[in-house]
């Protein structure tokens, strides 16, 4: 009856979760080919924030972003960058728990690079945690696969960019991404 149906559901859900873990792992080892397009950073950030807005609202977390109309477009894979931002937001929401702020800013770092900064008012991290966060399987949260940030780093590096995390216990965290304006040309030159 009901109990075996519930069990079947739990098993299906678990199988689904494991499949996801495996596919994330495979992605980590061999990230898929990047599908380069002209990306409007403002639109990308707005879209990615929309995807988590309900979840954030239900936890009392404010999402702050002021678009910069003068920001240059970049050559990048929008789906992958979306994945990067979502991982960072979900990470931030987990660090905050309830009632806090996630702030996103975008600017031109220099002529060749744009900079996206995601700041949260969460619980922060120790030096040990900071050093380990981009390592696969490292997670400070129960029930997390701990692959999110390793995947994030992989995608950013694949774009020829860099990511840095800064944090102190009790003082939130700051994730800074630098992305080349024209990553595709660099990739072509490397072939």
Which role fits each region the language model picked out?
Residues 155-157:
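Detector for a conserved hydrophobic position within an alpha-helical segment of the HATPase_c
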Residues 12, 35-49:
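A conserved beta-strand-to-alpha-helix junction within the catalytic ATP-binding
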Residues 37, 57, 62-72, 109:
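Conserved catalytic submotifs in the C-terminal HATPase_c
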């Amino acid at each position: 009856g009901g109990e075996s149906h519930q069990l079947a559901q739990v098993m299906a859900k678990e199988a689904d979760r494991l499949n996801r873990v495996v596919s994330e792992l495979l992605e980590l080892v061999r990230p898929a080919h990047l599908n380069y397009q002209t990306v409007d950073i403002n639109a990308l950030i707005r879209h990615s924030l929309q995807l988590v807005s309900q979840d954030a609202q239900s936890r009392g977390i404010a999402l702050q972003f002021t678009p910069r109309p003068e920001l240059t477009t970049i050559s990048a894979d929008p789906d992958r960058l979306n994945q990067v931002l979502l991982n960072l937001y979900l990470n931030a929401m987990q660090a905050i728990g309830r009632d806090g702020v996630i702030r996103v800013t975008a600017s031109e770092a220099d002529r060749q690079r744009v900079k996206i900064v995601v700041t949260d008012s969460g619980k922060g991290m120790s030096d040990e945690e900071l050093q380990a966060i981009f390592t696969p399987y490292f997670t400070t949260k129960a029930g997390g696969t701990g692959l999110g940030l390793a995947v994030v780093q992989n995608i950013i590096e694949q774009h020829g960019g860099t990511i840095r995390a800064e944090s102190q216990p009790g003082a939130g965290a700051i994730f800074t991404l630098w992305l080349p304006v024209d990553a595709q040309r660099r990739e072509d030159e490397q072939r």
